[in-house]
């Protein structure tokens, strides 16, 4: 793991005076990620959908930006979010890799033998199925892990539990009856920190960039683009193809580029100009570190 992933580099300071848009409810993993970037006191603006998140983040009167999940180490890329980002005027200024820990939460005093049903998002239930199948519990799917925790708290039920974050337990005064019940312990979600283009700060010691490009799809053209990247000594840490809306099975490409010197990135951008129809730089930032969820 490099120094950036260990968190040794200087950490930029991001302004959050108007609040930070997140997808989901308070107590969600988006809020956990926001706290790791902005601090525990950060005010979050819950959004029902990622489209709402982009809209709120783009409004200077509504927020100071957003935290948005972009991929998971098990489920893969959240493809619609790449399209939302491409159409927006937001910039990526940071990233964080959150270790996802799913926990069984109950009202104070509730024991395992009291539980009759467990509420959570379908993905969280699926991630914890090996643990849950040990018990004859009814599994209730909901729209959000944190919302499940909130409902268990509000109903004061002795027979209901929720699967959610430890932050949700803290916010809704629930006990963590069983921590880290997910089957796969190495489960990470990558979150992007977004700011409006005109307000995006220059990142000291930046060593990563996210870009999108389209080629003319002639024979070998993608290989030529990748050769330019390799010749500059840049590590291509991600390459994701996406259909171009309205085209006849033509694709654009999202790429994450890791570099040591900014001149390497400049060399790539100059080198691929003649090989691409369009290029958009989503942001230039520091490679993120792994933090506990």
Predicted regions, residues:
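Domain-level signature for soluble enzymes in the chorismate/prephenate branch of the shikimate pathway
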Residues: 1-293
């Amino acid at each position: 793991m490099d120094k950036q992933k260990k968190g040794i580099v200087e950490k930029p300071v991001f302004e959050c005076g108007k609040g930070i848009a997140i997808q989901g409810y308070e107590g969600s993993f988006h809020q956990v990620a926001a706290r790791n970037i902005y601090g525990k006191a950060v005010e979050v603006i819950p959004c029902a959908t990622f489209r709402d998140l982009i809209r709120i983040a783009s409004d200077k009167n509504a927020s100071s930006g957003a935290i948005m999940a972009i991929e998971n180490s098990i489920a893969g890329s959240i493809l619609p979010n790449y399209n939302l980002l491409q159409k927006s005027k937001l910039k990526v200024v940071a990233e964080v890799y959150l270790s996802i820990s799913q926990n069984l939460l109950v009202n104070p005093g509730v024991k395992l033998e009291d539980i009759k049903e467990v509420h959570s998002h379908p993905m969280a239930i699926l991630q914890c199925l090996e643990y849950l199948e040990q018990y004859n519990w009814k599994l209730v799917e909901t729209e959000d892990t944190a919302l499940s925790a909130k409902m268990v708290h509000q109903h004061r039920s002795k027979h209901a539990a929720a699967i959610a974050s430890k932050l949700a337990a803290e916010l809704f005064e629930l006990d963590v009856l069983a921590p880290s019940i997910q089957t796969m312990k190495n489960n990470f979600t990558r979150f992007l920190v977004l700011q409006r283009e005109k307000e995006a700060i220059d990142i000291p010691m930046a060593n990563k960039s996210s870009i999108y490009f389209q080629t003319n799809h002639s024979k070998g053209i993608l290989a030529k683009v990748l050769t330019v990247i390799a010749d500059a000594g840049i590590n291509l840490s991600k390459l994701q193809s996406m259909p171009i809306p309205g085209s006849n099975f033509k694709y654009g490409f999202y790429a994450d580029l890791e570099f040591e010197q900014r001149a390497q990135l400049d060399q790539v951008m100059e080198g691929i100009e003649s090989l691409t129809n369009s290029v958009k730089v989503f942001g230039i930032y520091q490679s993120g570190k792994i933090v506990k969820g």
